[in-house]
Structure formats: structure tokens, C-alpha cells
């Protein structure tokens, strides 16, 4: 038998196998998506498929209805670099955020020039005397509309071998970003990597008295951690507290003393404060944080 005949037989066998499998699971052909979902759940109840398989099948069914706008990281939460940043400034933000890919914004912050992958900075760390120009190591950015369907986006990620895309609104303005991980998590559930635990922690100890705080950390969490009593009547987050104390949007490196605690902006852009370093008075560090 020729290879061509063998391949044809294999295809028939595979088709027959899946037909038998589907017939065993779905005795009655579903008429619509809702009936199909019911049959999938019934199959799990009858132990024809396990819980994980059921969840993944449901996830695949649901992503067809979703748009990129539903799952994207909004622009206000994007951590970005600027085209005019030097090597040290890029490294500071990369180390502070622990991300691996960064949108690089134009000088006026109106559009994305491309993506920077953290590993592309390694040669410059070994040879810092080499001239560094962020534009020379940029990767091209995939740009998609908010209205794009999630399942189509997944296919595009696969075809273009890309992991991240910039999302724009109907007027062409940047509204957020989406990653392949965001989509896969809709199917298989949350994906843990070596940085996930660190990224989810809002308050991280750097030195004996210095802590890194995400600006979106709620004041209540800050108070519970440091046994303080900052008011959350007018603002909800530490970033809001710092901006209120400054009376304007502070820049990276700006610092201010609030009730004996020194708040220094470690990451910020033209729209928001992203990360803050807090120096706690030595005599006010709770015992649970002394280790």
C-alpha cells in the first residue's frame, strides 16, 4: 500500500474514531449551542469526561462569544516604556514590574512604536559601553480592534507567533493590550508561571524599612499590613492617596512625606502612578514584617 493510501486510511480511521466518541457522548444531536453545553455538562455528570475536560470544552464554547474588549488589560493598567528611555530606566521598570514584554510608547504617548522583550537587553548588560537605542531592538506590534473576536485573535497569535497585541478603539487610540495567556486562561483556567505569585502581591519588602507598593493597592490593605490608619473616605488606593497629597500627578522619583511615611514614585507615566516605594519609620514596622 502506498503512503498516500495509508494516509487516506489514517484520516478515515481518525474520523471514524471521533465519530464513535461523539456518538457515545452525545446520543442526541444538539440543535444549538445551549443544548451542546447541556450535553457537555451531562457527560461530565455521567463520568464520560472529567471535570477538567468539561471546563475546557465550555471555555472553548464561550470564547466564540467574547470580544477582545471583554478580556483586555486596560490602558490605565499597562506598564509601558518610552522611546526615549535609556538602559537604566528600562531596567528599573523591568525589574520592578517583573514582566517580560513591554509596549514602547511614542514620546507623546499617543501610539505604540513596538514591543520590547526584556531578554533583548541582556547583551547591553554584559557590554554597557555599547550604544543603547531602544528603537534598534523593538519588535513590531500586532494591533487589533476592541471588536475583534477572541477566537479569531487566538488564531492570529498562532499564525504570527506572537504573544501580545495592542488594542485600539474605534478612533484608533490605544485602549489596552491582550496576551495569548489571557485567552488560554479562558479555556484552561488560570496559568501559573514563576512570576505569577510575585505579580499578585501588592506589597513587597525590598529592604528592612522599604517596601514596593502597587499604586492600585487599596488603602485598607495597606492599613492592615502596616497597622496604620490612613483614611479611605476620599480616595480608595495608595496611588490616589499619594496623588491627593501632591495635589497633581507626580513624576518618577518624586517623593512626599505623609504622617511620617515617605512615599516615592518608582514607576509612573503621563497618566498615572503605577508603583510606589514606601519607607516606613523603623520604630513603626509591625513585628510580622520584621523578618
Swiss-Prot record:
The keyword Ribonucleoprotein does not apply. SUPFAM superfamilies: CBS-domain pair (SSF54631), FAD-binding/transporter-associated domain-like (SSF56176). Residues 72-131, 137-194 form the CBS domain. The keyword Membrane does not apply. InterPro entries: CBS_dom (IPR000644), CBS_dom_sf (IPR046342), CorC_N (IPR054115), FAD-bd_PCMH-like_sf (IPR036318), FAD-bd_PCMH_sub2 (IPR016169), Ion_transp-like_CBS (IPR044751), Transptr-assoc_dom (IPR005170). SMART domains: CorC_HlyC. Pfam families: CBS, CorC_HlyC, NMB0537_N. One of its GO terms (molecular function) is flavin adenine dinucleotide binding. PROSITE patterns: CBS. Transmembrane segments: none annotated. Gene3D superfamilies: 3.30.465.10, CBS-domain. Keywords: CBS domain, Cobalt, Magnesium, Repeat, Transport. One of its GO terms (cellular component) is plasma membrane. Belongs to the UPF0053 family. Plays a role in the transport of magnesium and cobalt ions. This is Magnesium and cobalt efflux protein CorC.
